[in-house]
Regions:
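Generic N-terminal amphipathic/basic segments
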Residues: 1-12
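Boundary regions of SH3-family modules and the immediately adjacent low-complexity/disordered segments
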Residues: 1-3, 19, 26, 30-35, ...
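Residues located in well-ordered beta-strands
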Residues: 10-13, 32-35, 205
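Short, structured beta-strand/loop micro-motifs enriched in basic residues and often containing a Trp
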Residues: 10-19, 73-86, 175-185
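A structural connector/turn signal
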Residues: 23, 89, 185-189
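Active-site nucleophilic cysteine motif
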Residues: 137, 149-168
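Surface-exposed patches in mature extracellular/periplasmic domains of secreted proteins
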Residues: 145-149, 174-175
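...with weaker cross-activation on analogous glycine-rich loops/strands in unrelated enzymes
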Residues: 170-209
């Protein structure tokens, strides 16, 4: 596709208007695919390919030629620099469900970008599926609530549900109002483990029958 780009920072806010003073409606993660709707000075209006979400991000840090082969399976993965054959941690991370390309690897580390390495145990093949939903949701225990957030630095309730599906390469809407329309309604008496439950302004997951 001609208008087909991939985000190349660990994450950034998606704003409703081209200013950091406007509302944050969501975030975009490393390796996430999007198209550019328009450009405005230092900003671009984008539409994410996964869920058709629109908003503004800064006009930097994206690429065209990118074929993700793996994804981050840890809540956040420490980034390392390789100096004289030693791996030195730096104060940067890449977050759960981010898509990456494997450039080089050794027994314990993989290089996903030039001179940026992460631990091999922190990634899975891009086609890996985690059927145990509770395993993913437990990763985010004690994560603070953040409107528009999509990572362990802060996440909102609808993003928490969506991130499970995104990790598993399955579609699910970003916002609660759209999630309600997308889901099949069931009786309260029929709640089972794994059911998605909506109430005023929020969404959650049923852990037990």
């Amino acid at each position: 596709m001609k208008n087909n780009f991939y985000f190349k920072k660990n994450k950034c806010n998606i704003y409703i208007k081209p200013t950091t003073k406007s509302e944050v409606v969501s975030q975009i993660l490393y390796g996430e695919r999007f198209s550019i709707i328009s450009k405005r000075n230092k900003w671009i209006k984008i539409k994410t390919i996964y869920d058709n979400y629109t908003g503004f991000i800064k006009n930097d840090k994206f690429i065209k030629n990118f074929k993700p082969s793996h994804k981050i399976s840890k809540l956040k993965s420490q980034i390392f620099k390789k100096i004289h054959n030693k791996f030195i941690p730096i104060n940067k991370f890449i977050y759960f469900a981010s898509r990456i390309t494997l450039r080089k690897q050794n027994a314990n580390f993989i290089e996903f970008e030039k001179d940026k390495w992460i631990k091999k145990k922190d990634v899975k093949n891009i086609n890996h599926s985690e059927k145990k939903f509770i395993k993913i949701f437990k990763l985010f225990l004690k994560t603070k609530y953040l409107w528009g957030g999509k990572s362990c630095d802060g996440i909102d309730c609808s993003a928490l549900i969506q991130i499970y599906f995104y990790y598993n390469n399955l579609f699910f809407p970003r916002d609660t109002k759209d999630q309600i329309k997308y889901c099949k309604k069931i009786s309260k008496l029929s709640y089972k483990s794994g059911n998605i439950i909506f109430w005023k302004g929020h969404v959650g997951i049923c852990l037990k029958n």
